[in-house]
Amino acid sequence: MIQRQTGRRVGAVKHRKPHDTGREHLDWLALVDVSGPFLSLPVLRKTWPALDGLTKEQRARLRAEHGAWQRGGDVGDWIRYVLRDLLGWGDALHTDGLDIFKVDVPEHDTTLVPGFVLVEPGKDVAPEATRLIGLICEGDPVRRVKGSEWSATPADRVAHLCRSHNVPLGLATDGRRWALVWAPRGGVTTTAVFDAITWNEAADLTVVRAFVSLLRRERFFAVTDDQTLPALLEASKDNQELITERLGVQVRQAVELLVAAIGRAEAAEIERGGRGLPKDVKPEDVYRGAVAVMMRIVFLLFAEE
């Protein structure tokens, strides 16, 4: 006897909610202190449909190393773990023999020497083979150094080193704060600061994954040139400039529509026997007023976003 199943579909497929890559990127960007042009959302979504993940073993190691550091362990051990193991730089990380990168800043009676560099595997330590210049500091990498002849922040100093050697990427850290620096020659400096104080918590895993996605070894040595971090930053800048240009065109069109609407409203009021605009109001005054109103709306929406 065959029993008939009722009330449910046999073999029904459960559909998972689509993964919102935009929200994932917005989540970690909200927890990173960015100054200057950075990675745009379209570039992030195209390059990382999903952020690079960490294995169960990597997460366990991260919690252990983070805990040792927070319990008073050597901050140098923590920094070495992050660079060599978490990011996987391994033998591409160099911390000795870096005098070749020394830069004198005579006007501030200061000499800059990096604390570490990332060099192409198998190459001698030299600026032309270097992908990133790093500096270890004693305090917040984006705050001025007290008691120094030069009050520039550690991030500013890394940017100076980067431009001196034509290496666009830098990293300044005190162990807790990791300031990614983009310092292209002839361009403005960008800093993106990741705070590692809660990296051992599950809620902060997205930020850790973003940090690893941007700076892991493979991003420097195992992708095509147009997929390296400097190239992605350049592409983001071009994307942002295009958005700004389009916004300018849209604002101008909106101003013209607003001025035309004001003109129609005035004509309608006069037809009804009203006075219209005061006689001393010139057309250019109306246009300037419309521009002022439209720009305030744009800035308000930008601030809200």
Specify the residue positions occupied by each region the protein language model found.
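Generic alpha-helix structural propensity
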Residues: 74-78, 111, 153-156
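Acidic-basic catalytic patches of nuclease active cores, encompassing PD-(D/E)XK
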Residues: 67-102
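Glycine-centered helix-boundary capping/hinge motifs
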Residues: 88, 108-111, 166
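Short acidic loop-to-beta-strand element that houses the catalytic metal-binding Asp/Glu
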Residues: 102-134
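Short, basic/polar, glycine-containing "phosphate-handling" surface segments that engage DNA
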Residues: 1-70, 125-302
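Adenosyl-5′-phosphate
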Residues: 305
